Amino acid sequence: MSTVGFHTCASCVDGPKSIKCVSKYRISVYKTLGLDVVKCRLPADCGVNCGMPAAFVLEQGHPKLTMDGYCGEKHRGYVLSGAWRHAQLRSLNAELDTLEAREESLRAQIKALSAGDHCPAVLAYVPKKLTKLKAEVHDVTGKKQVCITGLVDVMDSALVRLAPDSPPKKISSL
C-alpha cells in the first residue's frame, strides 16, 4: 500500500499528532482503500456526537474497527465512568430550554394575532396564520415531551447506578 494519497502537513511530519490531522489522515486512508468513511458511533449512542473517523486495522485485507488514543480511549473512559450521562443531560436540557423559548414565542404570536386590531386586508390571513402557529405549537409540545422523557430516562439510569443496593461496578479492560 502506498502513502501517496495519505494526509500530510507540516505539523504532522513525524505522524499525525493533532485530532484534526488524525481525522484528515483517517479520511485519506479510507479514500485510498476505497472504503466509505465510518464515523465514530460509540459516543453518539451515549448522546454526544464525536464525528471522528473510526480507527481500524487491516486483518487479512479487511478493516476491523479498533480503539486508539485519539478517540477510542477517551470514549472508553467516558462510557465506563458514566460521565456521558452528564453531557447528555446538558444537551437535553439545552434542547428543552430552546423548545420552551420557541413555545413561548409562538404563544405570544398567537395571543397578538387573536387580540389585535387588524386592517381588513390582514384579517383574511389571520385565521390561516393562527392555524399554522397552533400546529407548530403542537409540534413543539410533542418535541418537548420526547425531550422530557429522554431526561427522565437518563436520570433514572443514573439513579439506578447510584442506588446503594445496585450491584458493584465491574470495570473491565478492553
Curated annotation (Swiss-Prot):
The keyword Coiled coil applies. Residues 86-116 form a coiled coil. Keywords: Coiled coil, Host-virus interaction, Inhibition of host innate immune response by virus, Suppressor of RNA silencing, Viral immunoevasion. It holds the Pfam family Viral_P18. One of its GO terms (biological process) is symbiont-mediated suppression of host innate immune response. Suppressor of RNA-mediated gene silencing, also known as post-transcriptional gene silencing (PTGS), a mechanism of plant viral defense that performs sequence-specific inhibition of viral mRNAs expression. Belongs to the virgaviridae suppressor of RNA silencing family. This is Suppressor of RNA silencing. The lineage of its organism: Viruses, Riboviria, Orthornavirae, Kitrinoviricota, Alsuviricetes.
